[in-house]
Amino acid sequence: MKKLALLLSLALSFSAIADDHAPTSSYLVESIPFTLKDGKTMADMMAMKDEFAAVAQASGLQYSAFVMTPHYMSQSSAPIAGSFDAVWLGFSPSATAIGAGYEGYMENGQELEAKFDELRTMNQRSLMRGEMVHEGDPSDGGFGMFRTCTLNDGADMEELRAALKARGAAFEKAGATASTHMWYGGIGIPNEMQGSVIIVRIFPSMEAWGQAFDRYFAGDFAKEERLLNETATCGPVRTYFGTPFYSASAG
């Protein structure tokens, strides 16, 4: 089964920009934190996959989705208002694609949306631009590390991109397999997220994350960490497991 790394690679395959000073791949990411209603479980949520796929295909939805369940994290570290059980993430190649897809979904998916409403509640929906700044290994499985950062005075996005590329290359040289992304410029984000950047590292599996974690503390990445710290101030790391919900076909 395809999981987080493969789904994200598929979403990214829609759009690539070949410029040393621009993102390797760009996309839009929709984030919907949700809480399951009393008596409902994540199994009930995942049981909706086939119905969602049918509506998405009928609507021409260029949109790959999966459910992120928190693992190592504290509520205060997440840029989410209120408590939540999981986060729905959806990837689309452009605003045009997501807008056209939503029009189709609103026409074809009202009954399905009513079923979702019986399962979960949500009080936040945001849309951010995403960039892949370092490409790692796609494979089965998915474990994500997230940090919320703000640019330091005098720093810009190009410098942050360069710092993340340098870190990704150094980690890869040490044997890490993660892809590195940054998300920013959100619509619908909380006030405290204004001007922030979410740095995301996607590992093929939790074991791959554990191997990278051990190698990080066994190695010397002082140069790369200094470059990042000179560019941005970041909060604590939080992690999630990713489970696929729907995979759009590229092209």
Where are these regions (language model features)?
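Gram-negative bacterial Sec-dependent N-terminal signal peptides
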Residues: 1-18
